[in-house]
Amino acid sequence: MSSQAETSQKEDDLKTSGQLGDDIASLFCTSNFDGSDRDYLPEGCLDNLITAENVKCELDKFTEGLHCLKTEDSRRRNRETYTDDFRQELGRWIQNNAPRTFATMVHCDLGPLHLLMSMQKCRDTNFNDQSLPILAPNSMPESWNASIWPRHKLRDFYDKQWKFLAPVFSKYEYHYDCQKNCIFPFTKENVPPRYGAFSTVYKVTVHAKHQKHDSMQAVAIKEIQIIRGDRKTQYDCDVTWDNEARALKSINDIGHDHIVKCIAAIRRGDSRYFMFPWADGDSLRDHWDGVPKRDPDAFTIQEAITQLRGLADALDCLHDCKNRDEIAMETKWKLKTSSQTHLMCKYKMSMTRFPAP
């Protein structure tokens, strides 16, 4: 059973154990895209866990932490402040506004009293899921209590927040600007990467809950080799990547069957990526090498003419593209499976050359 199917099964069978942190961890999936395994929570899983009822059950445990307070007067004031109605109302606010923030704090093992106090501060200052991520491990939000969030706890929150912030790729969005520690919800397929002069292409599967494209199975992630150098070199590389992303977006707008669309242009820290559909048929050269030679017949001749006419029309459309001056097309073609035939597509186009590393 795949990890995605296992997650769905766990969600269907889930009955909270009373240990919310364990219940959340049981739904984690693993991304292997970055060379080492990184856990993330699939989109939508918190909907079944961070309910007002479950949150209140966690907040009700605050009395377990009252013994840490030095005086009986302090313990009494906390009981009077954090009434049942107060915790119920706070639970509803957390469910509607800060489920990711709450889940991250649960995984930081704050203790129930500090968890309650921290979420109260978040509500009072409107620190919610839209405030995530905190951008540095030493960047404590102004409203947070420094005694509850010493440096090591703040670092823990910074590291664990990414588990709940994996991006969702929508057909209505093209540009994605992610923080450097963002976890991609990808599983690398057992296919050797394809290395080019300025890029590496990986075959990956995007978790089903992190993509909103019709019938998108495997995708190609093209990682651009960005030169690490002085500020001007970095700036030039950024401009080059921006130009390529813009040109690919213009090509998408052509909407030609023989031109594979770029699904997404992704920044992650200093790294740059493009996402394309995976071409199942591989390159035309590989196709010829792998298919036994045979004498042409009427069907193959007609199919070849149809494909060549489609490619010629695609090239004509590219010539008329408003960004055609930025396009430097390469002579590599891809075969994309369509029903029981193959559709030849212009797949690999380099908009602008990246300097050699």
Q: What is the meaning of each model-derived region?
A:
Residues M1-Y202, H207-A218:
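Non-catalytic localization/regulatory regions flanking kinase domains
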